[in-house]
């Protein structure tokens, strides 16, 4: 699973996931399912915010390419992926500036158009069950919840899906692709079932060629959202090095 994750996701997402796990004393090499889940969640958060801006009139627009000098503001503030201290600093700043209620738990995003925090969920189970778990934990009507599944289902607070259908379809397609790639390599069952995960871990430890059969191509396109995060946690030289550090399987 670890090798699959390192080839399936952008290196910067992988590093953010590793930092998040280490912050809680977790090892990506041991808790590989959690590693995969965190990388997936990070990517969904970044895809959620990609290309969405607010123009000078305060209208929400989608811009995939255009005039870099245009007066545009990112519609979403990304909170997920930052260390806890920085994340709470961002949340406090937003609350002080906008007057919105401070959440009890760190949310994933802030929507400047709707003036609300957003909690993003990615589940391997039924969306409505995971939605209720999130809602019971957060216990706040102020934080908007949006849940995606690997089967293309989604659920959001008051059926308000925030994004346009095409943007959500990109997220769903990516999740479905991840599921199919895992399934084709016999990793999906262990990703869903903790018992199967333990069995798979023992099998992986005995394997002499953990890379065999894994994809060697990864998208080199850096998410616009990731670009906005880069200055806060790495310099340009380190970023360039990470982009070039895609894991390659050893040749026989």
From Swiss-Prot:
The record marks 195, 198-199 as: Important for efficient shutoff activity and nuclear localization. Plays a major role in the shutoff of the host protein expression by cleaving mRNAs probably via an endonuclease activity. This host shutoff allows the virus to escape from the host antiviral response. Hijacks host RNA splicing machinery to selectively target host RNAs containing introns for destruction. This may explain the preferential degradation of RNAs that have undergone co- or post-transcriptional processing. The active site is at 80, 108. It holds the Pfam family Flu_PA. Keywords: Decay of host mRNAs by virus, Eukaryotic host gene expression shutoff by virus, Host cytoplasm, Host gene expression shutoff by virus, Host mRNA suppression by virus, Host nucleus, Host-virus interaction. One of its GO terms (biological process) is viral translational frameshifting. The keyword Ion transport does not apply. It comes from the Viruses. One of its GO terms (molecular function) is RNA binding. The keyword Transmembrane does not apply. Its main location: host cell. InterPro entries: PA/PA-X, PA/PA-X_sf. The probable endonuclease active site in the N-terminus and the basic amino acid cluster in the C-terminus are important for the shutoff activity. The C-terminus acts as a nuclear localization signal. The C-terminus is recruited to host protein complexes involved in nuclear Pol II RNA processing. It comes from Influenza A virus (strain A/Duck/Czechoslovakia/1956 H4N6). Gene3D superfamilies: Influenza RNA-dependent RNA polymerase subunit PA, endonuclease domain. The record marks 202-203, 206 as: Important for efficient shutoff activity. Signal peptide: none annotated. Belongs to the influenza viruses PA-X family. It is found in: Host cytoplasm; Host nucleus. This is Protein PA-X.
């Amino acid at each position: 699973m670890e090798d699959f994750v390192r080839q399936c996701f952008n290196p910067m997402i992988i590093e953010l996931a590793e930092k998040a796990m280490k912050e809680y004393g977790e090892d990506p090499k041991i808790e590989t399912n959690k590693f995969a889940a965190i990388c997936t969640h990070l990517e969904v958060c970044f895809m959620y915010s990609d290309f969405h801006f607010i123009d000078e009139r305060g209208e929400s627009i989608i811009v995939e390419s255009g005039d870099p000098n245009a007066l545009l503001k990112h519609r979403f503030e990304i909170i997920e992926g930052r260390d806890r201290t920085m994340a709470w600093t961002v949340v406090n700043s937003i609350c002080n500036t906008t007057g919105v209620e401070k959440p009890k738990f760190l949310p994933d995003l802030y929507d400047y158009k709707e003036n609300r925090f957003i909690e993003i969920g990615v589940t391997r189970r039924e969306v409505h069950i995971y939605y209720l778990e999130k809602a019971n934990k957060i216990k706040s009507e102020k934080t908007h919840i949006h849940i995606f599944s690997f089967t293309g289902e989604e659920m959001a607070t008051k059926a308000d899906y925030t994004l346009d259908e095409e943007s959500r379809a990109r997220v769903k397609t990516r999740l479905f692709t991840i599921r199919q790639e895992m399934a084709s390599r016999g990793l999906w069952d262990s990703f869903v079932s903790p018992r199967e995960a333990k069995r798979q871990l023992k099998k992986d430890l005995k394997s002499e060629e953990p890379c065999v059969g894994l994809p060697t191509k990864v998208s080199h396109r850096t998410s616009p959202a990731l670009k906005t995060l880069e200055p806060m946690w790495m310099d340009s030289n380190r970023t360039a090095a990470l982009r070039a550090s895609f894991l390659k399987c050893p040749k026989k």
